[in-house]
């Protein structure tokens, strides 16, 4: 699990964070097992109330618009949501054009550096390679 600060955000910001991730699951009209696993992991980190979790699950079936998700998104929650949206989008091994466009829209809304998404994608690739090296190491430890 990522060392994180999502759980330190106010409850309302954690909810908006989770809604944006729910939106991202449907950007390309395809929800892979890897994306869902990442979504569930991040949702757990958000520490939402049972009622809020129920609302987020409804958003998975009928996602809000990106504009709705961005409307109440604070700076810190936005940066964390963008980071986790990048992780989710890349979790299936590729980031398609629709996903990349949505990520860029989020970064633009947050007024981040022009190369923010590119840098987050590079960081994600490095992180996934590091994780794979860990799995490879575990396999090499067997006799």
Task: Outline where the language-model segments fall.
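Small-residue-enriched hydrophobic alpha-helices in membranes
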Residues: 1-143
């Amino acid at each position: 699990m990522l060392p994180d600060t999502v759980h330190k955000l106010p409850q309302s910001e954690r909810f908006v964070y989770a809604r944006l991730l729910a939106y991202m699951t449907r950007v390309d009209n395809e929800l892979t097992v890897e994306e869902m696993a990442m979504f569930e992991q991040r949702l757990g980190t958000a520490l939402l109330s049972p009622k809020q979790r129920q609302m987020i699950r409804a958003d998975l079936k009928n996602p809000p618009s990106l504009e709705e998700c961005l409307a109440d998104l604070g700076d810190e929650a936005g940066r964390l949501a963008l980071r986790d949206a990048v992780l989710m989008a890349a979790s299936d091994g590729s980031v398609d054009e629709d996903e990349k466009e949505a990520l860029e829209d989020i970064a633009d809304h947050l007024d981040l550096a022009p190369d923010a998404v590119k840098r987050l994608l590079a960081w994600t690739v490095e992180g996934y390679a590091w994780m794979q090296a860990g799995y490879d190491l575990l396999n090499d430890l067997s006799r």
